[in-house]
UniProtKB/Swiss-Prot annotation:
GO terms for molecular function: structural constituent of ribosome. Keywords: Ribonucleoprotein, Ribosomal protein. This is Large ribosomal subunit protein bL35. Belongs to the bacterial ribosomal protein bL35 family. One of its GO terms (cellular component) is cytosolic large ribosomal subunit. PANTHER family: 54S RIBOSOMAL PROTEIN BL35M, LARGE RIBOSOMAL SUBUNIT PROTEIN BL35M. Gene3D superfamilies: 4.10.410.60. SUPFAM superfamilies: L35p-like. GO terms for biological process: translation. The gene is rpmI. NCBIfam families: rpmI_bact.
Length: 65
């Protein structure tokens, strides 16, 4: 059986943690930031965890993680 390929888009966006969780960045923080409030931009800093319902699809995209 051939090797499975990792989705390049997923390996750039997700980081698998030791406890089995997956870390991701927040959306809505790339451009058109002038109309967003300072509070909103501050809350979008840092990282978040992928929801439990989405873990299966992320795991399919990252077969060796």
């Amino acid at each position: 059986m051939p090797k499975m390929k990792t989705k390049s888009s997923a390996k750039k966006r997700f980081k698998v943690l030791g406890n089995g969780g997956v870390k991701r960045a927040h959306a809505f923080k790339r451009h058109i930031l002038t109309k967003k409030t300072t509070k909103n931009k501050r809350q979008l800093r840092g990282t978040s965890m992928v929801n439990d319902r989405d873990l299966a699809s992320v795991a399919k995209m990252l077969p060796y993680a």
